Amino acid sequence: MNIAMTERYKWLLFFLFILLTYFIPLETRLLWQPDEIRYAEISREMLVSGNWSVPYLLDIRYFEKPVLGYWINCIAQWLFGESHFAVRIVVVTSTLLTGWLIYKAAMVVWRNSALAFNAMTVFLSSFLVLAIGTYNILDPIVTLFVTAAMYSFLVALSTPNKKGKIIAYMGIGFFCALGFLTKGFIAVVLPALVFLVMAISQARFKEVVCYSSIALLALAITAGPWVITVALQAPDYWNYFFWVEHVQRFIAKESARSQPTWFYIPIVILGVLPWLGFLFGALKSAFSLKKGTLYFLLWFTLFFAFFSASKGKLLTYMLPCFVPLSILIAHYIEELKDRPDEKISKVNASINIAFGLMGISAVIYSLYSAKFALYDTNETLKIVLAISGFLFWSVIGAGALFRQTQFLTMFCSIGLSLVIGYAIPEKIESRSTPENIIQRYYEPLSNKSYLLTDEVGIGTSLAWGLKRTDIRLTETKGELAYGLNYPDVKNKYYSLEQLLALIEANQYKGVAIVLVRPDRKQILTKLTTLKEKPIVEKEGDLTLVFFN
């Protein structure tokens, strides 16, 4: 592929890449629990109940996030029905719009369409972005709003006239408010931190402080109505959301999400594939503070440092960091065009070849390892598809190596994107994507008066699959523990003793329990030694117990 042809067809090939990686796989992959189905079910319940102010999950108050993400998902479900496409189209659209803002931001600074195109391409083809940006969680949505706020500040700095600055600062406040309504204070605090440091470094502190009142006013007007409404309808919402979901998560050492400070370093290294060969050179170049890189460097380093300092860590928190990182990598790739040495490009291509081969080796090794076994012997098609996805990655890497073009690099992930929905091992599928199992047992599950489970994620999956919210919990309360403290939902949780009493009182009829790996607990033994024996069905990590 020569340079002229690449320029001529790059947009056509780019849209083909988007179609193959972001849209075609949407309906083919089952929804993952707990995250994807949780947000789908909250939106479904909101749409059915008409309560647009206070989020509920399984008819239990759920205060972990604000409402905007649920509202947007409600609209998608209203337009497209309760499908995988409807559930995921919001995050996909958010990710693609973030890519477009990356293009716009690069154009504001460098007025270089090739650099801007590369920045957008690097972002949308990065491994972590592809994984999170097509997965129904709130991070892609809040990343869009944070990116829009950061872009607005960039425009405010570069606009000479007062009217343009006022509009830009109104945009900052508006988009920070949308981010706040999606995921909370983080969408305001982190951009403000970057704005402050950038203003000081550019000797424009007075100007930024002066115009910030406009942003604060726009933020208050946008977010204020819901902030007041939820405080009136659920007076303890803000106490829980601020102290538990923000302060405790940031400082709690014993949190379930607690990870070491270096946790995100390997995530960035792996997540930036297939552009890893350019990562360290891009950061080194950015730290030299060449024209235009300071803002994006501050954006990346301050966000990264903040999330690394937090005790509670999740892989998805890194998504906003990949916006400025993609721009820095694209800037470095543009710098390399002026150098005759193609060593960095060859290193990057070689890394992609090696990654594909390592993936193939890992799949093959798992077939002969009892400890790391992924697939059963009857999953031949899944094994072939997994190997094919990694093989495609290596082949594209080899093409980039021998043809000496970076344009091919973005296509590395297409193979995995297309096959991943069909290549998930059954042992993972049974617990993490239980939709098929629920549909297989739809009739015996749906006709039960009492339906219980020992894991919230499975309960949410049952609610989504059966379109009923009267799912009850037993043994564990999980993320619904706070909501279960309300007196009007005391019948939503049963201890083991209460469950046994319920079954007996119901004359051993009309009760179904879905258990996750019950061999580690006493519950299955207790259930199977009752006076009347239940029907027990084993499906991977799930065990279904029926009292008919």
Swiss-Prot record:
The keyword Transmembrane helix applies. InterPro entries: ArnT_tfrase, Glyco_trans_39/83, LipidA_mod_glycosyltrf_83. It holds the Pfam family PMT. It catalyses: 4-amino-4-deoxy-alpha-L-arabinopyranosyl di-trans,octa-cis-undecaprenyl phosphate + lipid IVA = lipid IIA + di-trans,octa-cis-undecaprenyl phosphate. Its EC number is 2.4.2.43. Keywords: Cell inner membrane, Cell membrane, Glycosyltransferase, Lipid A biosynthesis, Lipid biosynthesis, Lipid metabolism, Lipopolysaccharide biosynthesis, Membrane, Transferase, Transmembrane, Transmembrane helix. Pathway: Lipopolysaccharide metabolism; 4-amino-4-deoxy-beta-L-arabinose-lipid A biosynthesis. Catalyzes the transfer of the L-Ara4N moiety of the glycolipid undecaprenyl phosphate-alpha-L-Ara4N to lipid A. The modified arabinose is attached to lipid A and is required for resistance to polymyxin and cationic antimicrobial peptides. This is Undecaprenyl phosphate-alpha-4-amino-4-deoxy-L-arabinose arabinosyl transferase 1.
